[in-house]
Amino acid sequence: ECPVCHAKNAFNEVKGEIKLAAEHKFGVYAETVKNNPDISEEDKKYIFDQLMANFNGECSEVGMYLCMARIAHREGYPEIGLYWEKAAYEEAEHAAKFAELLGSDLESNMTASTEKNLAWRVDCEYGATAGKFELAACAKKNGLDAIHDTVHEMARDEARHGKALQ
């Protein structure tokens, strides 16, 4: 019965295991290309290199687009700034899809397990906090206030990420 209109035939009861018609998968490259004897080593290398290059390119675009958004906002172009932010998010989605295709071939610590990924990234965020703090201290020592202030704030962000993931 429909919970809104109370029609008797609005729903069909599902019995047994539910099967999804389609689903995203982690590590498609390893599953379909890496050990596939029907694909030449040359093509395997090309596919892997292009997946990696696209992942890295998409990640770079995220940073550049957000930088351009900040510039546009400072110059008084909020609509352009907001569009750059939207484009950056879309590029981040592209990077995520390349990462998902590459799976553990992108980063051996990355797995299809949320629990394992959380534990790994907590350690990474704590390491990133320390690394950025050291860079900020070096910048401060050399009188580079803009670099110090920006990187020190990023270190705090990394610490917050680590705490949140913990």
Mark where each language-model region is:
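Non-heme di-metal
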Residues: 1-166
